[in-house]
């Protein structure tokens, strides 16, 4: 008797969503800076009225423990500590009557503050 192993490939869902709108805005900001090596780093840190808050910065360096997602030629970086809080989140950019800003829709957040800049899990 011989056992035949069946090679089944399943498509894993992305750990987070980086929208076209967010990628386009990041590309625009990188072009303004004139440094094509920049990547958007999204992170979670302690603070805010709900316990944690989101942060955004540009970075030229990809660390060994970073998770990287590339969309429309733009790279998004999330460090290992922040990753656990952002799994399943959508990183978007909104420009509406309330203003223009990057927005994170996070299914892991059990509550958030009124301004939406901090959350708890």
Curated annotation (Swiss-Prot):
One GO-annotated biological process of the protein: iron-sulfur cluster assembly
Bound cofactor: record note: Binds 1 iron-sulfur cluster per subunit.
N-terminal signal peptide: none
PROSITE patterns, per the entry: HESB
Keyword Lyase: no
Similarity-based family: Belongs to the HesB/IscA family.
Protein name per its UniProtKB record: Putative iron-sulfur cluster insertion protein ErpA 1
Source organism of the structure: Polaromonas naphthalenivorans (strain CJ2)
Gene name of the encoded protein: erpA1
